[in-house]
């Protein structure tokens, strides 16, 4: 670029004027001294670095045009151009110079300040060092240093460590003694603390051993140093885990569980047509003979969970008993047992004992002693009925919890019904219907003055333990024998009634007399058969006469 | 879990506990020995005694921590025994024979409510067979 610029400059300098005299003069400059030419160019056009090729080309074009017009106009334009270029050059130079000078000044001032600081510090230190030997050097010390450091304080000397004293040994001994004393104290405090911890843990694990000896399963709790106990291992369907921990207030142990209720019991009531309670029974578990408070809590939780589970099972079963007249809500289950009476099943969650029993009317006070005895007997009977229903419900739920027993002993039931479905309400309804059907049959026979013998054979009568009792309550098929004496001179009719809890054959009546053997599916047909038999006998007796 | 894997896990657990016990015991003994070693000040200046003061305190704390570790091992052993040993029996409901008989009688009574019940006669079965013989 610089070479090109120089060439352009040479060209422009050559084309400044076309007069022979001027051209000749220029040639002389070239021949004589090239430096002078450069100086002249610089004087006329400024520094080389400011020259631009475009500007020079424009000038050449203008000069060619000017040559064609006139010399005066060309001189005027040249002057204007020079003036323009000069003004531009002046402006650029001023700006560049001003910027450079400002930056340079700033940098220079910073350097000078640093140097001044270093010189001042050197002067201070030098003056302070010489102040001991030369009095005039104090004058050159700065006021700040003079006020803080006394003169002649800077010397040519070495610092020595402090000499050992007799008290150093005593000091070290005191330090060590203090350390040992504090360590001894710390150890004694730790001993007391850990002894307390050991005692507490001893009590804790002693209680846990009692729980384990009572055959309750224990588990490690994640994220906790305490153990958990499963309190639903016997009769519950829910998991039933509770954390065993110490109460900080009373220093006793408790089982921390997440049960919804603090107390729960199944309650069975009998309502009359006016929905008044005429009999009730609230379940209560027998008290456990144990001295451990923790075990008592666990048994209580087990009972609560058991009652909650049995209630949930009853609700679940009630959903499939709608065709048998069972109605249920979230709070109660209603099982109709006659036109005027309903069995109500609820979960009692309050601690208040609401076992009211028989509801007495005002009129009962005016009854005679006979009526009073009757009412009392009825009350006791209703109470007994409710207690028995409650007991049977619990027994059947226990059987439901033993799934393996049911699966192994009654495989046909396992295939027929859902293994997880509870079977509590249906047996109760089944036995009630059996009672009503038998009662209806007896009434029909009595109306016709027919003698009979009712010989039931209930499955629980042969049970030797409670496990057999549980199984007997869920037996699918029963066998009840009847003996109907239609006449004093004719043989009796033997009837075998086999009601069925599950399956298609709900009730089968097998009738056998001296002439034939028949099978019926309903009591109505049996009654018709007996009537037909009686009519046949009467016709036969007439013929004989 | 198979018995082999259970045995391996049991051995590993035992080794871990033994190692913890050994480490804690060694820590207690070594720290106690260190405290006794630096307890004497003879031939030491105060600049040497000063750091030993802090060493004694650190060793003391280390001893206490080792004891706590031993307690933790004891706790683990107890918890392991309580949670992993099998029980030979399960909690059972306390029933008795009189209660069973009472329940049976009550069930029969309620089931036969308002019904006239007759005892089953052995002769009834023999009488039943008689018509069959006559038919023959």
Curated annotation (Swiss-Prot), chain A:
Residues 148-168 are annotated as: Disordered. This is Mediator of RNA polymerase II transcription subunit 17. It is found in: Nucleus. Coiled coil: none annotated. It holds the Pfam family Med17. Its main location: nucleus. It comes from Schizosaccharomyces pombe (strain 972 / ATCC 24843) (Fission yeast). The gene is med17. Residues 149-162 have a biased composition (Polar residues).
Curated annotation (Swiss-Prot), chain B:
It is found in: Nucleus. It holds the Pfam family Med22. GO terms for molecular function: transcription coactivator activity. One of its GO terms (cellular component) is mediator complex. Its main location: nucleus. GO terms for biological process: positive regulation of transcription initiation by RNA polymerase II; transcription initiation at RNA polymerase II promoter. Keywords: Activator, Nucleus, Transcription, Transcription regulation. Component of the Mediator complex. Belongs to the Mediator complex subunit 22 family. Component of the Mediator complex, a coactivator involved in the regulated transcription of nearly all RNA polymerase II-dependent genes. Mediator functions as a bridge to convey information from gene-specific regulatory proteins to the basal RNA polymerase II transcription machinery. Mediator is recruited to promoters by direct interactions with regulatory proteins and serves as a scaffold for the assembly of a functional preinitiation complex with RNA polymerase II and the general transcription factors. This is Mediator of RNA polymerase II transcription subunit 22. The gene is med22.
